[in-house]
Structure formats: C-alpha cells, structure tokens
C-alpha cells in the first residue's frame, strides 16, 4: 500500500501547493480537474466502507474496485511530479509529455482529459489575442509577452505622429511588429507550435489596427471556441482564419485613407 498511498498524498499536496493564486490559471484549471478525481475517489472509498460494514467486501472485490484508482493516482503522480513548479504552456507540455510516454489507452485518455481542462484558460487568452489583439495575461503564462522597451518606443512614435501612409507603416507599425511583442519559444505549447507565428502576427496586426485606426472590425463569422483535441484540425483552421482576418484588416487600414489625426 506504500506506493499507492504515497501517490495519493503527493497528488493532494500538489493540488494544495500549485492551486494557489500565483501559479496561474492553467494550474488552477488543472488542480480543479484533479480535485474532481479526488472527490470521485472519496465517494468510492465510502461505498467500499459500506460494503465492508455489511460484510460483503472480499479481498478480491476490494482489489477489483480499487485497482483502477491505483492506476489513476499512479498516473496523476507522474503528471504532477513532471509539471511541479511550472506555469502556463510548460504545464501543458508536461502533461503532453506524460501522455506521449503512456502506452495504455486509459492513461492517454486521462491525460487528454487533463489537457482539455487545463488548456481552457490558455485558449481563452489565445482567443482574446487573435480575435481582439488584446494581451490579457495577468500570470505571465502566454508564450507572447509585451516588451516594455518596445512599448515605450511605440508610444514615442505615437506622440510624434506620422504624416503619411508610408510613415505609419515604417513608424508606429514597425515598432509594434518588431519591438512591442515578443514570442517566448520555450513557453509555446507543443500542440500550438506549428501555428505560433500566425498566432503572434494575428494579434500584432489587430493591436496595430485598433491602436492606429481606432476602427470597429466586423466579428469573424466562423469564430468558434478554441479547445484542445488530439485532432487539431479545427483549431488550426480557426487560427488560420483569424490570421487572414487580421492581415486583411491591417492591409485595408494601410491602403485606405489615413485615420483622423494622423
């Protein structure tokens, strides 16, 4: 019983430690998913206790009921040990690493469930970025960060103003593109790696569009909720569509008449 009990205790400790505020939304979502599994296990223990008191719990029946839970906590121990101390995309990558090393279907399904739950707040950040050009990342979990030196340079350009369309492209826009936002390669989730540049530029383009143009942009007609799936086609297509929309918006801004005040 030593190993299973140790796994259970370690998982509970992880939830208590890494569920704290400073560990970010991805960890909060992961810990919430694990808490649900802990609750399910507590219910099972109560049911087994009732069978024991009724005199109908044999060793064979106990083993039959408890073995799946032992496997679950062994896997949860591997996951939590692998991601301990990490935040954001590194947590998601850690779960995916454990899933890739697991040969049992049940283990892969559990890892996929954890990824789906833990990635929800991450995809909300991605959505705000690629659909609104808004970087809302209070825990510094996202793989795109705001570079303060670039921000100051962009603000200086904005105060100086641009007097022609070409100046707008080479002035404020250039600083936003090259200085204002930075892609942190180490923090990119594996399942978004192929789309990371389009995600970066879609948000950048919209950020410039709204900062320079101050215009309303039509909502994307096919905007769907981004979510994790081992079949990533739908997510990739949504990101591609968001990138095309952002590119068209910025092109239209630079090809059209200068915004008022520029």
PLM features per residue range, with description:
Residues 1-262:
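Long alpha-helical rod scaffolds of large eukaryotic non-enzymatic complex subunits
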């Amino acid at each position: 019983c030593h190993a299973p009990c140790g796994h259970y205790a370690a998982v509970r400790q992880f939830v208590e430690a890494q569920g704290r505020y400073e560990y970010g939304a991805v960890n909060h979502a992961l810990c919430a998913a694990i808490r649900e599994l802990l609750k399910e296990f507590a219910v099972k223990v109560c049911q087994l206790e009732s069978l024991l008191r009724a005199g109908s719990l044999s060793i064979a029946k106990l083993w039959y009921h408890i073995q799946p839970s032992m496997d679950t906590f062994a896997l949860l121990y591997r996951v939590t040990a692998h991601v301990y101390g990490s935040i954001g995309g590194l947590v998601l990558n850690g779960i995916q690493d454990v899933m890739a090393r697991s040969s049992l279907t049940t283990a892969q399904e559990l890892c996929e469930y954890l990824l789906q739950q833990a990635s929800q707040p991450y995809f909300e950040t991605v959505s705000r970025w690629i659909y609104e050009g808004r970087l809302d990342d209070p825990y510094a979990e996202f793989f795109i960060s705001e570079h303060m030196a670039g921000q100051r340079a962009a603000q200086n350009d904005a105060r100086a103003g641009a007097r022609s369309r070409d100046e707008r492209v080479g002035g404020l826009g250039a600083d936003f593109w090259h200085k204002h936002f930075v892609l942190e390669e180490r923090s990119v989730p594996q399942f978004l790696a192929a789309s990371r540049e389009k995600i970066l530029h879609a948000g950048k383009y919209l950020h410039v569009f709204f900062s320079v143009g101050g215009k309303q942009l039509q909502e994307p007609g096919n905007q769907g909720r981004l979510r994790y799936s081992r079949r990533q086609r739908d997510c990739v297509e949504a990101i591609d569509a968001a990138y095309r929309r952002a590119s068209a918006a910025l092109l239209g801004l630079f090809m059209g008449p200068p915004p008022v005040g520029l």
